[in-house]
Amino acid sequence: MEREIAFGLENFNTDINTMKRNVSEVISLLGLNKIRDKQTTEISGGEKQRVAIASVVSMDPQIIAFDEPISQLDPISAEEVLNSIKRLNRDLGKTIILVEQRLDKCFHMADRIIFMENGEIIGQGTPKNIPENIVNKYHLPTITYIFKEAGLQTLPITVKEGRDIIRNNKFQDLKEDDLKFKEVVMEIEKLNFEYERGYKILKDLSFKLHRGEIMTVMGENGAGKSTLFKIIAGMIDKYKGKVLIDNKNIKSLKLKERIKKIGYLSQNPNDYFGRKTVFEEVGYTLKNIGEYKEEKVEQVMKLLNISYLEDKNPRDLSGGEKQRVAIACTIITDPEILILDEPTRGMDAEAKENLGEIIKTLAEVGKSIVVITHDSDFAGDYSHSVMLMFNGEIVAKGCARDILYNSMYYSPQISKIFKNKCNIISSKRAIELLKVI
């Protein structure tokens, strides 16, 4: 890890004494002492981000630009990275430019905010003074938008401010009936997985997924979430236990059957791209299984609002555009089970809302959806059930409202505001409640 931090200094031909001093100081500043002797392959996602930050800071630039540094991180790791960024500004006087979609985490940190659209600056302001043309759902933190939509004059930008606003109000807990799913489409029985060196990644996992269910899977980076669903998607076959799809062992399914049963979106959309245009890319799997129809490709591209990209090279797109193209590649075969690993990464609020509505529509027609995410607000708005993983084990699984509302780290922002007042996890329900105060 130390060598990684020193790499930039080596390229600048920095003398050894200066290099040692800079690396040591940056390691202390960013709290990396515990992992200084580890390989970069052995550390968590949050630690990797902080090492990357340290690599830049060691060269002592005056301006540091961060492009979505917390987009793939769990809540705890995200806070660690943002705290490191704050220290660079506060303690070292660095000028920070932060590009980020997770506004709830960082909006309040800014001295100045620049709003862009279609390559143009459409407004500037501060967290407490936002231009009127910017005050809409897609340019505000979730909690700010919720209070604005409810008609309140005082708009919070942090959980504490939101709690202060409703401090003297009383609410009744929601009494909604939980959906009762009947038909099991996937069952995992005593699944275990370990690397060749004997380190156990997954430990005796068992759970079920039902037809029409939207299940969100959450947990810290390195908890085993992606590994579990790579096994279910058939990408890893050396495991112990059973993966049953419609009561059939997945190992007995032929490739075409598996493609029709399970659609899998990996964390990296670039994994899907090898064709010259987006249109070719989206239709590629259909050609492979002998079911290509041009109108089907057009239909899916329209659904995900990517028709305007059809002639572009998928590798030339923005992060959010790549993500939507990869999702189109995943759902084009109309699979019964859809597994989406970090599907909202790089998406703005509008794209996330559109994706959420697509997921709801698919579930309503009987598709089963698994969403692996760190986005608690997205989970609160669209999940039927939630499964929490820690260190390769399932530590909780159940109704989304029960799991998310009672979680310390994975509850949506709005749940934190209503804590001990109302068991709410959904933005829409929060707006309804706030309209009457």
UniProtKB/Swiss-Prot annotation:
SMART domains found in the cross-reference section: AAA
A GO cellular component annotation in the UniProt record: ATP-binding cassette (ABC) transporter complex
Main location: membrane
Keyword field: ATP-binding, Cell membrane, Membrane, Nucleotide-binding, Repeat, Translocase, Transport
Function: Probably part of an ABC transporter complex. Responsible for energy coupling to the transport system.
Protein's name according to its UniProt entry: Putative ABC transporter ATP-binding protein CTC_00753
Domain ABC transporter: 1-143, 179-416
Subcellular location: Cell membrane
One Pfam family of this chain: ABC_tran
Class of the enzyme per the UniProt entry, highest EC level: translocase
Family as reported in the entry's similarity comment: Belongs to the ABC transporter superfamily.
Keyword Translocase: yes
EC number: 7.-.-.-
InterPro entries registered for this protein in UniProt: AAA+_ATPase, ABC_transporter-like_ATP-bd, ABC_transporter-like_CS, ABC_transpr_CbiO/EcfA_su, ECF_ABC_transporter_ATP-bd, P-loop_NTPase
Membrane topology type: Peripheral membrane protein
Binding-site residues, ATP: 219-226
An annotated Gene Ontology molecular function: ATP hydrolysis activity
